[in-house]
């Protein structure tokens, strides 16, 4: 579509019902501010110019909306005098001249490009106002779209609707497309002769008809127009988003044993033939390649899991974790800012942070890379085909050469050459018959403590 378009995002509400210290549009859906989802939908609809109408938390909202995919200009609505008043806060942007003006809300993160494009296409056919509506089983509380012979006659609020009109299930979704050449004239005709003294965008329908123009409605799925005013609605939107994304991934070849227990971030990338077991959480910045397996109860964030690698169960991958092909990070392991080479194994109860583990190496249970000295982080380098025995502490900065072997229980503070064997522990001593003597001493000490406590 070659027509020019300005999208106006209304995001100036007080968010009172959210009971929050920040604007509702900043609350995350799938790990990202909900307003960023709206901007992405606009970008997907090939809309590049956005006027953002802000109120509280103006700077933070503007930052969240500036995703880089569109050009965003912010406009402050100083008073809250209705939706039409909010749109006119962006008058300077409208005056630049566009074929289409599209009005959307910052709290509808489930909206997709399809209804936005459909609305613009109907403007291109010569209509002056296009309202995006939805069909619902329970229209109570919604404004009804009064349509006759394909033309939208009015938007009737529930409280003002007749009994016959209340039986209508086609409802106003709030989003609207307006002919750019007529937008300012139409908006300027909206009055505030109502109980609240506010300027309502919905009045445009009857205004344009009174001037001989034409208004119509296009339908979108109800869930796409779901707005967010409360924490309960935020949770509902999150659930809908997760359901939609899981379905998309499974249709693309990802297997999920119990999809309802898998939680994805907005940018999670799962390739074909990835298997995800129950109760897995993906944070932002995750890419999982084909054939990888994410076992149950794992948490993955900011990580790259390469082809054929396995994670978990009960594993945590933190930002910067990079697992090589067919590598393994097993149960109760944590990996942070570390590269695990191809075929390397970190099987049990291990922390690998700020480290490089070479291909084919085996890291024993309980191994820790001691990367933090209280002030700075330091790097541990482990070569290829190296064996680290159980319960080893590798005190960074330290390097262990390829093919080396580190004995169980060692504390390694110096570099280990390739193919060397390193012991970093005290030699075991055995004292025959000493155990009964120690037990007697311990019992006596225990009795003495009890006696002192009783005397207090």
UniProtKB/Swiss-Prot annotation:
Record text on cofactor binding: Binds 1 Mg(2+) ion per subunit.
UniProt entry keywords in alphabetical sequence: Acyltransferase, Cell shape, Cell wall biogenesis/degradation, Cytoplasm, Magnesium, Metal-binding, Multifunctional enzyme, Nucleotidyltransferase, Peptidoglycan synthesis, Repeat, Transferase
Binding site for UDP-N-acetyl-alpha-D-glucosamine: 10-13, 24, 77, 82-83, 143, 157, 172, 229, 318, 336, 351, 362
Enzyme class, UniProt record, top EC level: transferase
GO cellular component, one term: membrane
Enzyme nomenclature, EC number: 2.7.7.23, 2.3.1.157
UniProt-recorded Gene Ontology molecular function terms: glucosamine-1-phosphate N-acetyltransferase activity; magnesium ion binding; UDP-N-acetylglucosamine diphosphorylase activity
Binding-site list for Mg(2+): 107, 229
Binding residues annotated for acetyl-CoA, in chain numbering: 365, 371-372, 390, 408, 425
Catalytic activity: alpha-D-glucosamine 1-phosphate + acetyl-CoA = N-acetyl-alpha-D-glucosamine 1-phosphate + CoA + H(+); N-acetyl-alpha-D-glucosamine 1-phosphate + UTP + H(+) = UDP-N-acetyl-alpha-D-glucosamine + diphosphate
Region (Linker): 232-252
Cofactor(s) recorded in Swiss-Prot or TrEMBL: Mg(2+)
Stretches the record annotates as N-acetyltransferase: 253-456
Superkingdom per UniProt: Bacteria
Pathway participation: Nucleotide-sugar biosynthesis; UDP-N-acetyl-alpha-D-glucosamine biosynthesis; N-acetyl-alpha-D-glucosamine 1-phosphate from alpha-D-glucosamine 6-phosphate (route II): step 2/2; Nucleotide-sugar biosynthesis; UDP-N-acetyl-alpha-D-glucosamine biosynthesis; UDP-N-acetyl-alpha-D-glucosamine from N-acetyl-alpha-D-glucosamine 1-phosphate: step 1/1; Bacterial outer membrane biogenesis; LPS lipid A biosynthesis
Family indicated by similarity: In the N-terminal section; belongs to the N-acetylglucosamine-1-phosphate uridyltransferase family. In the C-terminal section; belongs to the transferase hexapeptide repeat family.
Protein name per its UniProtKB record: Bifunctional protein GlmU
Organism: Sinorhizobium fredii (strain NBRC 101917 / NGR234)
């Amino acid at each position: 579509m070659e027509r020019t378009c300005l999208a106006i995002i209304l995001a100036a509400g007080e968010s009172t019902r959210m009971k929050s210290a920040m604007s509702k549009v900043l609350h995350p859906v799938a790990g990202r501010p909900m307003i960023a989802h709206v901007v992405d939908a606009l970008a997907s609809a090939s809309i590049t110019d956005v006027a953002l109408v802000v109120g509280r938390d103006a700077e933070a909202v503007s930052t969240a909306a500036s995703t880089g995919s569109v050009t965003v200009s912010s406009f402050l609505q100083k008073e809250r005098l209705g939706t039409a008043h909010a749109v006119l806060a962006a008058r300077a942007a409208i005056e630049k001249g566009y074929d289409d003006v599209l009005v959307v809300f910052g709290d509808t993160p489930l909206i997709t490009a399809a209804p936005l494009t459909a609305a613009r296409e109907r403007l291109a056919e010569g209509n002056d106002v296009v309202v995006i509506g939805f069909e619902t089983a329970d229209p109570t509380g919604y404004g009804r779209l009064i349509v006759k012979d394909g033309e939208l006659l009015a938007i009737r609020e529930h409280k003002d609707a007749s009994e016959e009109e209340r039986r209508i299930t086609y409802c106003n979704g709030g989003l609207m497309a307006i002919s750019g050449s007529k937008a300012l004239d139409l908006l300027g005709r909206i009055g505030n002769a109502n109980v609240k003294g506010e300027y309502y965008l919905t009045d445009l329908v009857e205004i344009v008809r009174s001037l001989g123009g034409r208004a119509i409605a296009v339908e979108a799925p109800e869930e796409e127009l779901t707005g967010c005013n409360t924490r309960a609605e935020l949770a509902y939107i999150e659930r809908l988003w997760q359901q939609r994304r899981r379905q998309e991934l499974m249709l693309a070849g990802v297997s999920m044993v119990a999809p309802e227990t898998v939680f994805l971030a907005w940018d999670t990338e799962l390739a074909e033939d990835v298997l995800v077991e129950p109760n897995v959480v993906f944070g932002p910045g995750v890419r999982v390649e084909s054939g990888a397996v994410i076992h149950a109860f794992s948490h993955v964030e900011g990580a790259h899991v390469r082809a054929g690698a396995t994670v978990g169960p009960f594993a945590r991958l933190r930002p910067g974790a990079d697992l090589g092909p067919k590598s393994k990070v097993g149960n109760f392991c944590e990996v942070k800012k570390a590269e695990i080479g191809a075929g390397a194994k970190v099987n049990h109860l291990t922390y690998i942070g700020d480290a490089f583990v070479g291909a084919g190496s085996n890291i024993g249970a309980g191994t820790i890379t001691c990367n933090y000295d209280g002030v700075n982080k330091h790097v541990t380098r482990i070569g290829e085909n190296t064996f680290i025995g159980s319960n080893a502490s590798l005190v960074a900065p330290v390097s262990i050469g390829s093919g080396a072997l580190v004995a169980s229980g060692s504390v390694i503070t110096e570099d280990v050459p390739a193919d060397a064997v390193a012991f970093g522990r005290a030699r075991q001593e055995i004292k025959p018959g000493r155990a009964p003597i120690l037990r007697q001493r311990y019992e006596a000490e225990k009795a003495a403590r009890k006696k002192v406590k009783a005397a207090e």
